[in-house]
């Protein structure tokens, strides 16, 4: 664990070569010595080659011929704006900290979490695998177009046999060459890429020179079959040289049929082809594990590559529009060979771009796979991809990826996969934009990238534009990719992943919660919108598990805080003993499946600790208004962890993932007769303190006897029928009259109604008991109570019970806070409590047809039993010396009643107005 003595930056000052570098942590792709690629070789070259691909040689005429120069420029501008928005996000994330192996996957997973990062990382990996196969098959087709034995026309060199098997053989041989280069390390790949870059640059240079040096000429176009299979006369295209009329004719759009597919072209279809060839901006980021300084190389190299390719595309668009008529542009997409000073150099460029694209895809895929394997998100299935050479090259991931590409090559034609590959790339780009957007919106102080040319507007536009392009290119593939991402995320969520990466969702939640808490003004509170906000004080959760779940049901969308007081004095301790306990309490909340916060404190006494928690728990307008305590009696505590499946498994004491079981983190329950941390005097004083602070109080007794189905999270419709009994009258002051409608009585009704709204208690019948004196006529008081319940929208049965004649005799009522100190003696108070207890017990087993009756009247119809009883809690006496007697009276009152809640409310909680 980090302390103030830990170094702020874990940097090794001197490496083997005397240079400073950070250690390569988890998720890296090798030892530090593997980081040797410069910005140019590691980022610029692979990104340029990936963004050019084969489009730069074979699709310039296609785009300009169908869309015209103006629309082609608009398409290019829109495409590069979309890419540039993602590049800005990449630059921001890459300059905000150390970037290890995995490129885009590393950025996404360390921001959005392992679930989203792992799912998109796997999709990005599969996109690179399929992209490698598509490039190789495109290269095979380009070679066979010139050297194939079945080539039509006289220009071909018919030396290579053709067919499915031969095509697979050629693709496999080329894959072996590409895989060998990647398996031997990033250094050889960089040199091979640089050689390819030189070949492509030389080929493009020859094309640019040819536009100027070659004179006008007629070019015979490939013949097209007639409508009925008849031959048509050969057509000709014209290379006019620089000509104003040619440019004028090429300015507007002229969409026609694609001679290779016969499909009618539209703006969307042409734009999709152009954009498909430009989606290579992550080629450099995928090499992050081999870069000397990825935080500098990735943004700088990517921006240079994007600017360079944009300039070349613009130049080629203008030159083609100035010099080639529309017939040539639409009838021969490979017209560069026809106008070149040396046509074989164009072929070399075509082959070099296809080969470099396949190499870039394969090595990028291997680095993503290695990072996924290092993070252990998919278990043993990716274990072989962890293997690295002595120099840090992940040859295991290369071999793994090579095998998958070989399987994809078996499918032969992959034109249908091209759109899926592009959509998967766009999903990854959108995720990078979303990662940067999340970091920006979270406003975390540690998000301070050195690259500042971005904002949340650019990130949001990047996400929206990538999603739009996905559905423009292929709606089916876009919908399928989002569905696949959701399924993979659900799988990783169920499996569980690393939690030490940090979740930007937590930062976003903090930002939003803080904003809305500041808007939650306690001065605007109204009784119409009152809700319970509970503070449950727990000594040992082993004995309080049923109460913990019952309180969760009582909160009804309100605040629920689990409070615990650790006894001690910080002055006499070397460190705070409370902080290490938070993890165990949070695990308790998770396993008990309750929606609660945890608040712990250190105090010399439980009473003082309770005062601390009552004052400081919560935040802003979300502060506890009700204190919940277990009842103070002599019942031996039970260990509910032993009987609850969520806490008793696994028996070995370890949970899945190797963390200790919760049963090992809390001490065993107190043994019978052992000293308690809280005295009876302090217990009652804590209740009195809460009432002085204007907090409602709930004392819970015998909650361990609650029916298990009533504490479940499901519906209680199929459970055994039970009653919930409410006695909204102070049974220790049983005078008739309107006592049942005081604030405390209404609070009892409100809490019982809240409980009945919980699904597990829907089937329980709410009964409200109305006590009558022996000389009171039944019916009148019941009518008033029913009218009140109707106004409060409370559905309940009302039952009248007759209180014994001696209970009402005697002096007028004392003040509520001094009921023990009045004329009534201890013996009389004890007798009154016993009589009230007998009355309540007599009604617990009665059905709805019992009618009025006293303790002796048990001749009514037997019905459902009482699952929970709500009793009026009298206010503690003013004299602390009377506290033990007060507690004894409460014990007598609630003895043998089963699960009971004694409640005292001090705040209005009901409203009859709209």
Curated annotation (Swiss-Prot):
InterPro entries: AA-permease/SLC12A_dom (IPR004841), SLC12_C (IPR018491), SLC12A_fam (IPR004842)
Bilayer-crossing regions: 37-57, 73-93, 120-140, 168-188, 194-214, 263-283, 298-318, 339-359, 377-399, 417-437, 467-487, 741-761
GO molecular function: potassium:chloride symporter activity
Spans within the Cytoplasmic topological domain: 1-36, 94-119, 189-193, 284-297, 360-376, 438-466, 762-914
Record keywords: Cell membrane, Glycoprotein, Lysosome, Membrane, Phosphoprotein, Transmembrane, Transmembrane helix, Transport
Bias kind Gly residues: ranges: 846-855
Keyword Transmembrane helix among UniProt keywords: yes
Region (Disordered): 645-678, 843-864
Glycosylation (residues): 218, 228, 243
Gene Ontology terms describing biological process: cell volume homeostasis; chloride ion homeostasis; chloride transmembrane transport; potassium ion homeostasis
Cellular compartments per GO CC: lysosomal membrane; plasma membrane
Cellular localization per UniProt: Cell membrane; Lysosome membrane
Modified residues (Phosphoserine): 6
Membrane topology: Multi-pass membrane protein
Extracellular topological domain: 58-72, 141-167, 215-262, 319-338, 400-416, 488-740
Record function comment: May be an inhibitor of SLC12A1. Seems to correspond to a subunit of a multimeric transport system and thus, additional subunits may be required for its function. May play a role in lysosomal ion flux and osmoregulation.
Record note on quaternary structure: Interacts with SLC12A1.
Record family assignment: Belongs to the SLC12A transporter family.
Name of the protein this chain belongs to: Solute carrier family 12 member 9
Organism of this sequence: Rattus norvegicus (Rat)
Origin organism lineage: Eukaryota, Metazoa, Chordata, Craniata, Vertebrata
Gene transcribed to yield this protein: Slc12a9
